Amino acid sequence: MCIRDRREGATVEKGEEYSHKTPIVFYGSSIVHGVGAGKPSSNYPAIIGRRLDSDFINLGFAGAAKAEKAVMSYISLLTMSAFVYDYDHNAPSAEYLEKTHYDGYKTVRAKQPDLPIIMASKVDYYSNEAENEKRRLIIEESYKRGIAEGDKNLYFVDGRKIFDEDLRNESTQDGCHPNDVGYLAMAKAFGDIIEKLI
């Protein structure tokens, strides 16, 4: 949809087609959803969608992204050009994450053997460094295991490294959820990878 003007007599016309019609799918927490963004178009999936002129599906669930089998099975059936598996925050513990992260990835991979999959660890790494390091290592182990099993289209984004160190405090609204500064950094980290894949 394209709105040309808000004044009386304005028209609503069909928008231009995306260069990449097959959507990028993003799965994760309130951070994927965009809870800290200044406006709906400022979360990192939306920024990447504009940058790459690609359709996208935002499956960000505030407090509820737990990689349940039914959810991952549903995701595995979606038509997509790439899958961003930003699952970490909502796992209630590192132990839960360890039980579900790799299995969630394998559920999608089993249905879509050639799909680019990008795993990520949390960006608010320094909020609880000991716990978050456990989680980061679990996700990195899922990645390494997939690579060892021959997955040639699997990628890992280390959340510790996304925010500029000089702007770490300015990159979230509450020490956890990225604001527009943080989302720009996330969009660059993920977008630079996705741009080469779709």
Regions found by a protein language model. Give the residues of each.
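Catalytic nucleophile-elbow at a beta strand-turn-alpha helix junction centered on a G-D-S/GDSL motif
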Residues: 21-42
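Short helix-loop-beta junction
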Residues: 45-57, 144
